[in-house]
Amino acid sequence: MQFLHAHLLSVVIFFPMLSALLAFFMSDQASRAYAIVIALIELLLVLLLWHGFDIQTAGMQFEEMKELIYQIGVNYHVGIDGIALFLLLLNAIVVLLCVIYVKEHRKDFAICLLLLEGILMGVFSSLNMIFFYAFWEISLLPVLYLIGRFGRNHKIYSGMKFFLYTFLASLCMLLGILYIGHDYANNYGMMSFDILDWYQLNFSSEVKTWLFVAFLIGIAVKIPLFPLHTWLPYAYSNAPTLGSVMLSALLSKMGTYALLRFLLPLFPELSEIYLTPIAIVALCMIIYGGFLAYAQKDLKTLIAYSSFSHMGVVVLGVFSFNVEGISGAVFMMFAHGVIVMGLFLLAGILEERASSLEIARFGSIAKSAPIFAAFFMIVLMANVGMPLSIGFVGEFLSLLGFFATYPLLAIIAGTSIILSAIYMLTSYKDVFFGNLKAGNNQISVFEDLNAREVGVLSVILALILILGIYPKILLKPIEQGSRQLLEVIEIRSLPFLGSLDTKIKEVSYVNR
């Protein structure tokens, strides 16, 4: 117990990865039960982190550091704040529900999901950039395997496009990482890749600009930002159901997390200088993604573009430079992960029963599967930001925070979200209440949800409603991380700008 207390975060990172290796020696049936037990233990370990997290304490918590290769600054250094804590929680919840849901090829999915869970725990906890980059890149491999092995049409093309886009873009970030490590050595006489050490560095204007661009490219493809999103519809729609869930619910959060952890605190002045073009890009994601979603005939592709559109709101919250906006962005990252997981699982159930996701093929499903229709409606309404749902809280706070920074664009973004309601409700009407084409017997006898599906989806609905009605559970620790991040941004921006610090106004909403 003493070891667990001292190294709890390391156990959270490496326990699922080591456990995944044991699954290689198990049967297909046994591996599913094994993966459920491991994922449940991992969730309990993350809840121990939650229980021990002190929102009154400044700085990183559960911090561990071990020198590995001192000469080149490679140290094992992990720690979390309120922002990282809830991405760990999201990761644990999503993986547990996925391993419960999995039906076929249980061993392959169990290994990939547990590996990816540990890798993502490392991404959200690493404070040494070499370890962060290693976890960042390795995360591609389990998803690439799932797409290439179990994907839909054009699975090889979709997998390779996803891999090449994200891998090559990340090489730009790697160049920036290596340069900063070398620059730290020139200034302090030794190399360091610890992000907390890097906060002490100042760069010349020219160097700073290309470093900012290098990091932004590597991060932008992962989110993805417009127009670097062209891999997304292929990967999301052609991946197996659980592959789509992992891509949209978790891997996209790696990008927005990197914006908060690295881009904003390392380059606060350039983040403000390029605020307008980045905000316009995010607005394009919301509007363009909404129109593309409305035009889709395939339900899974529609959900993919809907996910892309909503990530634009997260980006606006990140670049609000105030507590409300950043806290809203982090909350929406969690909410988006829960909602899009529900949407892709529901779409996967449709595909399993009907062997198609073409919206025009469906109709009148609500008659034969009323429970399925009810679950779909609740998740759908959360996706469009219905009040008292988890989707509303994140969108509202993100846009409210961005309104204080850029009122005009915030108003445009807020009104553009109406598109989400239009395309989601239209598709729902067609699938569940539309006219069924004659002779389509497979749809007319559509089977309702079974016990396992009801169990998984009930957890998602509980999260949607409980955290929508009582978001304070998440907002207090998130606010701690947001305030701490803004303090770093303010301190680093003072030598350069006199305006950014005036925008860092902490409006406390937790105690209202």
Each language-model region and where it sits:
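Transmembrane helix-loop-helix hairpins at membrane boundaries of multipass inner-membrane proteins
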Residues: 1-8, 22-111, 194
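Helix-coil boundary and interhelical linker segments in multi-pass alpha-helical membrane proteins
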Residues: 2-3, 121-129, 260-274, 314-332, ...
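Structural signature of hydrophobic alpha-helical transmembrane segments
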Residues: 4-15, 80-91, 129-142, 208-221, ...
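C-terminal ends of transmembrane helices
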Residues: 19-28, 95-106, 145-154, 222-237, ...
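Alpha-helical transmembrane segments of multipass membrane proteins
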Residues: 20-24, 96-99, 118-125, 145-146, ...
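Alpha-helical multi-pass transmembrane bundles of energy-transducing inner-membrane proteins
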Residues: 29, 111-115, 119-207, 292-305, ...
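Juxtamembrane/interfacial segments at transmembrane-helix boundaries in multi-pass membrane proteins
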Residues: 54-75, 138, 171-229, 234, ...
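Predominantly late transmembrane helices and immediately cytosolic-facing juxtamembrane segments
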Residues: 226, 340-344, 411-445
